[in-house]
Amino acid sequence: MMVGICVFELHLPASRSLKDKRRVVKSMVERLHQRFRLSVAETDHHDLLQRAEIGLAAVVAEVGS
């Protein structure tokens, strides 16, 4: 079994409101989940206008060569 995690921080300079930021982050979270089947969530900076932190996690039962 293999577990992978990743946390990254985004700078969103075009975001003019928290509503803009939430729209961008939600879209990114949904696309990452659908395309790569990852667990994805906004993990920090919820109330900051132009910053977001995204966390990813994946578990693979069998690692192939």
Model-derived features with residue positions:
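C-terminal binding/interaction regions
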Residues: K21
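N-terminal intrinsically disordered, cationic/polar leader segments
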Residues: M1-A14, S27-S65
